[in-house]
Regions:
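Polytopic transmembrane helical bundles with strong interfacial aromatic enrichment
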Residues: 1-128
Length: 128
């Protein structure tokens, strides 16, 4: 599981950098400032959670079962949260109205929060 978590973290980190550069250079010409800021929010949260997964994957104190649960909450949360933000920020560049799927953004955010809560509870329950 550690290998899967760490490779996923590396992929999320790499794509966050690519998307950040894409937003700063290519999208700067076609999006307004609010849309660019929204896009950047998606990039930031993707990178935050790439680093979080890297920590989880490298940690020796987190049980494998807990790692697996956190992994699935975080990866689904990033896809829903950051993915929907990318689509919503670039909505005017496509023929499809991505505002129809905007409801998944807060669901993704909730999944990210649950991943953090799961880590908190796991550490809180450990004997001191």
């Amino acid at each position: 599981m550690d290998r899967k978590i760490i490779t996923t973290a590396a992929f999320l980190g790499m794509t966050a950098i690519i998307l950040g550069a894409f937003g700063a250079h290519a999208l700067k010409k076609v999006l307004n400032l609010d849309q660019l800021n929204t896009f950047e929010t998606g990039v930031k949260y993707q990178m935050y959670h790439a680093l979080f997964l890297l920590f989880v994957g490298l940690s020796q104190t987190i049980a494998e079962k807990t790692k697996k649960i956190i992994f699935y909450f975080i990866i689904t949360g990033v896809i829903f949260f950051s993915g929907s933000i990318y689509l919503l920020a670039t909505n005017n560049l496509t023929a499809f109205d991505f505002r129809k799927i905007g409801f998944i953004t807060p669901i993704g955010g909730l999944l990210l929060i649950v991943g953090w809560i799961w880590l908190f509870v796991d550490f809180y329950k450990k004997k001191r």
